[in-house]
Amino acid sequence: MPGSRAATVLDDLPEWLVVDEILARLPVKDVFRCRAVRRSWRSGTSTYAFILGHHRRQPSLPIILHDHGISRVAGASASASSGQKIRPLLRYASLGICMRFITCDGLLILWRGSDFYICNPATRKCAPLSHPPRQQFISPITGVDVLGLYRHQPSGEYRVLWVSYAAPMGTFAAVKVEQPHYLVFTVGSDQPRRIQWPTVSEDGCPAAHPPIHHRGSLHWAMGCSITVFETIAETFRQMSRPAQLGSYVLLLDTGDNLALYVSTDHDRVTLDVWVLQDYDAETWGFRYRINLLAMDASPPLKLWKSIPRLAVINERELLMAQPPRRLLHCDIDGVFLGNVESEEHENRLTLSWHRFQESMISVPLFEAQEEDAVSNEPPFVMVL
């Protein structure tokens, strides 16, 4: 009746069931809308336990790059008629801006030159991030990069693994490049702590590819082994992988397991995917093979003598980068499912090495930034 409080289905359900089983499955923006409906929903969805549980229930989706910013795959499944779509995360302030980034738990660190930012696109919180000073090297060309972002479980802090490096140039090209320095920063701190790389590596620095997060550690494929950074002890170690695959493999994040893929033929027309079957025993098993020559794509594939970049959408579906800047949607049997399309009709799509799993997770730096009257505006806008 008019003026009376309308009954809803949710009114008949226990409060804990609504919060833990219904609200915990919604996207962040919908949880925020529900917070405005009832005070009990607001308090129930504000606990750290809910925030972590909510994050674990969100799909982990590949990140797509284009000239105007950063997007993500729209969902973990797509109908054959509509195809796989992408939706924007961040939009650059102007055309021509290109930022490097790394992700963890719905947080992104983005940087360009010496400007670093940490943000949560789902909550639209952002703050400048301090970085370690450049180290003193023989070479005049030095730099600082982010290798990884992770949650340090014992303290609950989010920490950044940095690398400070030197690069040879000109007359210094004949000089052997000095070993990089690896440092750990707590987000919001300006006190770095140097950590030791396990051995002198001939395979270079892991900055070329972002790490795969798995079982609380960061993983890079380097040479004939996998380099692991244990985020609790904050130490490096080596993990074995199938030696018969050669010296160049690429890691693949399946969402619930660690995998790698490689092309063992000279023309790079077949891709073999291996999955880590037992993490502690470091045993791997062959999972499936994709034959690019047999893929009936439209337009036809342009086969290059290089390994294409892959990203997992779900147990059966993949994204594949096709030069120059085309994205394919296929399954693990090598069946072409369509071309990836943008809701805003962006072209020149590039598949990143990263995944995004939205969250309501915050860091103290966000609150400190809100209290600071002086704001360092980032060169992007969060649009998720």
Tell me what each language-model feature is.
Residues M1-L384:
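N-terminal entry/capping and adjacent linker segments that precede and initiate structured domains
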